[in-house]
A protein has these predicted regions:
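Regulatory modules associated with amino-acid/nitrogen control
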Residues: 1-44, 50-60, 73-100
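A generic structural motif
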Residues: 59-68
Length: 100
């Protein structure tokens, strides 16, 4: 399987037709400009996450985003862009197959 193959296509290639969900976990300083800059990375690509959850606790902002059908290359690129946002401290990604 090529690393440039979209995750959804990879799921079909190995016989599993369940959708692939990419998850981003972002830890940042709790500053007003962080959330719009993170969501902009999806919006300017015409992507709408299936799930967005954020929690501010003191000076820490935690953001969890889930989006279906995002290719590995684009996922990695968006994660690199997130890491360049001022105030973002950590970005982790994972992908899973949704059942159903």
């Amino acid at each position: 399987m090529s690393s440039s193959m979209p995750l959804a296509a990879a799921a079909r290639a190995d016989g599993d037709y369940s959708p692939v969900c990419v998850c981003f976990s972002v830890q940042a300083r709790a500053e007003p400009g962080v959330m719009p800059r993170v969501v902009e990375l999806f919006a300017k690509r015409g992507l709408v996450p299936q799930r967005w959850h954020s929690t501010a606790s003191g000076s820490v902002l935690a953001i969890d985003v889930q989006i279906d059908g995002l290719g590995r290359d684009l996922c990695d690129y968006i994660a690199r862009c997130m890491r360049q946002i001022i105030g973002v401290e950590t970005v982790l990604t994972s992908d899973t197959r949704r059942s159903g």
